[in-house]
């Protein structure tokens, strides 16, 4: 049995990013998606990248930092299709929980991920979401009890659509990286400068 599956959501088109595939853009000479995947610490039992757009290139980029890649042929239909693929993979591996991280978030501190995992183990909540500066961020952990709901998601909402129907533990963290994503060239430049 796998206790915890980490899923890097790395399938999207990234249409607001005008410099090629944002996941393959580099921060400190490393692809954005690789830096994000590295935020999963050793206590995440299995790390899976869900790829779609430019799947071969993204899959090759993350191959050294994930345990496997899963191709999402429906990636153009929104983030929920990748969440579904990740939740199905976690369920297939009999996981206790799944932790989702968008692939365009290269600055999440691994200690934050560790705290989220610990909070899940200490809590009865269905989901654990990190909070910095009174705003929710990523990654978000969902207990196995949520897998059926996750595989039923549609559109471009991701797992946050469940926050109204499940018990959510908001976990205060001192990590601005839970909000730092790369959607535009300006976002990338800001990360390079910071």
Task: Please report, for each region that a protein language model flagged, where it lies by residue.
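Glycine-rich phosphate-binding loop of ATP-grasp-fold ATP-dependent ligases
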Residues: 135-138, 179-181
